[in-house]
């Protein structure tokens, strides 16, 4: 996350007062120095102790509780799609390395790219865990590419957003929104969008960017539009028709929109609430008052904001399982969950944390947000992505 020019968010309340509870014991010198913490795993890793010249940590939940040793940690930990510039992973990566001495590889991939790569390397895994869109992870599990591990605080995750076998666990959720350049809209006399139909107007469509559906964020956007026009998981023709109409008016389908947005080359984009809010309140590259984020309905009030879960799972036969388990525990701890919230990513443990006041009002989410049958989506996801891509004439489908 880019350091905010406006200072830290005003997150208050008892749930936010605790620091890292991980208890780290130094093995250097004649004595040992232990950081304070209850070792419960609710706000960091379990307590550490010294063994064979290195710290050890208690990790895992229930039957998966075990001890890992720093002596087994790698020089660098590889986890798919843990990357700077997305979901505030940069802050989590920095804090994890600072606390445990393990840097993470900056893995700049989408969920779809991660799934393709781990499938290609299934016989000789290069990464320790999959991270990304939850349903993409379920596909990896169904392919037999994951293994069981329930991180500490696994019991705090809603039942519908984790698998009983411990192969996939949700860590955060994001909702499809539209972000636009408020200043450009005002200068050009463009009325801000209220429904997805408004994004068809040529003055908006000609400078709008959508993510392709093979990325989790792009699939979420496609499902949002599809639902807004009466589609379903069994019928994606509405979004195909929509995309073809805006494409003819100049809309583009690509990733990495932020730089083009700040330069004004694109004045509207479809991603998540996190993307727009983090850009508005945390980025130094553009003034806060130039950015606006909104949730849209369909033309007749249909819900048009898909709520997308993201999560992770260990990979079968993956290298460095000890460090991976510690990292997975950290991500699900309150300390790690706060890092998501700092960038307006709603953590899976949000009920235990106070939400920043900069989020759109809850009433806006209630009017627009929807979910789907995630089991059905898993079964049909790849055919849905392919059908949309081919129907719109996007490359690579």
Regions found by a protein language model. Give the residues of each.
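Haloarchaeal acidic low-complexity proteome signature biased toward cell-envelope/secretome components but also
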Residues: 1-60
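Non-transmembrane alpha-helical segments in soluble domains
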Residues: 9, 93, 119, 137, ...
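Early extracytoplasmic/lumenal segment of secretory-pathway proteins
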Residues: 54-133, 137-138
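Extracytoplasmic ligand-binding site segments that recognize negatively charged/polar headgroups
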Residues: 82-89, 126-265
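A ligand-binding cleft/hinge motif common to bilobed small-molecule-binding domains
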Residues: 135-139, 268-289
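Periplasmic-binding protein-like
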Residues: 156, 240-244, 251-254, 287-316
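Mature extracytoplasmic/periplasmic domains
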Residues: 310-372
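Extracellular/periplasmic bilobal clamshell ligand-binding domains
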Residues: 357-397
């Amino acid at each position: 996350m880019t350091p905010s020019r406006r200072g830290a968010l005003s997150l208050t309340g008892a749930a936010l007062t605790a620091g890292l509870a991980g208890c780290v014991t130094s093995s250097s010198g004649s004595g040992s120095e232990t950081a304070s913490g209850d070792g419960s795993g609710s706000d960091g890793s379990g307590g550490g102790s010294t063994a064979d010249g290195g710290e050890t940590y208690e990790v895992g939940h229930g039957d998966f509780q075990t001890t890992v040793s720093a002596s087994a940690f790698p020089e660098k930990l590889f986890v798919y799609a843990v990357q700077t510039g997305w979901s505030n992973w940069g802050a989590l990566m920095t804090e994890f390395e600072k606390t445990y001495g393990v840097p993470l590889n900056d893995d700049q991939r989408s969920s779809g790219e991660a799934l393709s790569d781990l499938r290609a390397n299934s016989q000789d895994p290069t990464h320790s865990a999959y991270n990304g869109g939850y349903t993409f992870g379920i596909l990896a599990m169904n392919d037999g590419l994951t293994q069981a591990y329930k991180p500490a605080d696994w019991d705090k995750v809603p039942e519908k957003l984790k698998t009983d076998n411990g192969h996939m666990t949700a860590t955060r959720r994001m909702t499809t929104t539209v972000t636009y350049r408020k200043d450009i809209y005002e200068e050009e006399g463009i009325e801000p969008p209220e429904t997805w139909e408004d994004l068809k107007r040529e003055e908006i469509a000609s400078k709008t960017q959508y993510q392709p559906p093979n990325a989790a964020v792009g699939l979420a956007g496609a499902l949002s539009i599809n639902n807004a026009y009466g589609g379903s998981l069994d019928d994606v023709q509405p979004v195909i028709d929509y995309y073809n109409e805006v494409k003819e008016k100049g809309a583009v389908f690509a990733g990495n929109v932020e730089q083009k947005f700040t330069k004004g080359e694109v004045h509207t984009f479809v991603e998540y609430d996190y993307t727009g809010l983090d850009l508005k309140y945390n980025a130094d590259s553009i003034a806060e008052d130039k950015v606006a984020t909104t949730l849209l309905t369909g033309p007749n009030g249909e819900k048009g904001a898909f709520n997308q879960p993201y999560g992770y799972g260990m990979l079968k036969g993956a290298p460095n399982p000890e460090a991976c388990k510690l990292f997975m525990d950290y991500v699900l701890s309150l300390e790690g969950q706060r890092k998501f919230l700092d960038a307006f990513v709603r953590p899976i443990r949000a009920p235990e944390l106070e939400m920043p006041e900069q989020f759109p009002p809850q009433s806006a989410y209630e009017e627009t947000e929807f979910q789907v049958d995630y089991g059905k989506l898993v079964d049909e996801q790849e055919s849905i992505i392919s059908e949309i891509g081919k129907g719109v004439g996007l490359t690579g489908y």
